[in-house]
Amino acid sequence: MSKKSGKGKGKNDGDELGAEKEQVLRTKVESLIQRLGHEQERADRAKAAENELRARLFDLDKDFKNEKDRLFSITSDMTRQYKQMQDELLNQVNDLNKTVIEKDEEIKKKDQQIQDMTKDYEYKLKKKDDEIQDLKRKIEEMSAEFAKMLKDTLDKMQERIEMVQWDSDTDPQMMKRLKDMTGLSNN
């Protein structure tokens, strides 16, 4: 009985054991399915987070590109304004330098004119001084000649007076003769 009952029991035990195994396996499968569901949810959440991050990264990249374009535009505009102001200032400096050169040339011309006028004035002044000296010399010569003439005339008059007899002549006649000799009778 022992063999039979052992065999019979073994079959029942094997069925029980198989049912238990099956139950354990079903539990494991259900657990694995649940776990798979959780993992799928986790993967879906990770995928959603990844998509959200990608969208955010795309927006940030778009914002970055917009900001970069805006900064480039501002930089370009500022560079253009700077170059324009630099050109304007350079033109002003060049114009002012031209004006300075022109004014320097005008000053040089005026200085030359002043020098020429000064030389001309000095030349004319020297010429006038020379004329004055010449006229003074002539006046002195004429004065000397006149003095000589007067002296000669006086000497001649004295000679004539001495020659003329004072006794025979009357005073009015003598005056007339003196006037005739000196040429004062016409006055």
Curated annotation (Swiss-Prot):
Domain of life of the native organism: Eukaryota
Protein name: Dynein regulatory complex protein 12
Role summary: Component of the nexin-dynein regulatory complex (N-DRC), a key regulator of ciliary/flagellar motility which maintains the alignment and integrity of the distal axoneme and regulates microtubule sliding in motile axonemes.
Basic and acidic residues: compositionally biased ranges: 10-23
Location of this chain's protein in the cell: Cytoplasm, Cytoskeleton, Flagellum axoneme
Assembly, per entry: Component of the nexin-dynein regulatory complex (N-DRC).
UniProt cross-references to InterPro entries, sorted A to Z: DRC12-like (IPR033585)
Entry annotated with the keyword DNA-binding: no
Family per record: Belongs to the DRC12 family.
Keywords per UniProt: Cell projection, Cilium, Coiled coil, Cytoplasm, Cytoskeleton, Flagellum
PANTHER family listed in its UniProt record: COILED-COIL DOMAIN-CONTAINING PROTEIN 153 (PTHR28656:SF1)
Any single GO CC term annotated in Swiss-Prot or TrEMBL for this entry: motile cilium
Region (Disordered): 1-23
